[in-house]
Regions:
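M16 family metallopeptidases and their MPP-like homologs
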Residues: 1-12, 23-76, 82-134, 147-155
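Structured mid-domain segments that build the active-site/substrate or prosthetic-cofactor binding neighborhood
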Residues: 16
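Proteolytic maturation boundary segments
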Residues: 23, 134-183
Length: 183
């Protein structure tokens, strides 16, 4: 939980929106994606782990190149002070105007207690994010993301996918629609 501010800033800088590194690299600079994102997802219980989620929507014939490019930026995060400044301002601005209302008030309270926190986590994140630097984001990426083992989920027509390449990433399990949806 002490890492919450760094992770929030990492998510905003690296994988959050159209100004984030993932979108800029995968879609704008390399033309490999219709859409893309990556983020660390916080656990819902204090004994659980964070989960890393990355997504790229690309053409089947660009799959190999897109996976390799995504792995490259995940393991060697591009650093841009200008992009960091934009991300930091966006996160601080959003937190400044966000409000927890309705049933979310009690859900937030209970969620914080479940995590062992007695004050709203948003307060700590808001106060700490304003002092973070690009080096802090890089440190979070080094600790939580870089050089990990990932599970890939590929959705597409098997006839159009390079299954031999997929086998180089690990065991390949081909699922039918019935396997996925149960009918």
């Amino acid at each position: 939980l002490a890492a919450d501010p760094q992770i929030a800033m990492y998510n905003e800088y690296f994988g959050g929106g159209m100004n984030a590194i993932v979108f800029q690299e995968m879609r704008e600079a390399r033309g490999l994606a219709y859409s893309s994102q990556a983020r660390l997802i916080e656990p819902s219980h204090k004994d659980d782990s964070y989960m890393y989620f990355a997504f790229i929507a690309t053409q089947n014939d660009k799959m190999k190149t897109a996976i390799e490019a995504f792995d490259e930026i995940i393991n060697d995060m591009p650093e841009s002070q200008a992009a960091f400044d934009v991300a930091k301002e966006a996160l601080v601005s959003r937190m400044r105007t966000d409000r927890i209302t309705g049933i979310d008030v009690i859900n937030s309270y209970l969620g914080d207690r479940e995590m062992g926190v007695t004050e709203p986590r948003e307060k700590n994140i808001y106060e700490t994010v304003q002092t973070l630097t690009l080096e802090d984001v890089k440190a979070a990426q080094d600790k939580w993301v870089e050089d990990r083992t990932y599970v890939y989920g590929i959705l597409g027509d098997i006839k159009d996918l390079d299954v031999d390449y997929l086998k180089t990433l690990g065991e390949v399990q081909i699922l039918s629609l019935e396997d996925i949806f149960g009918y």
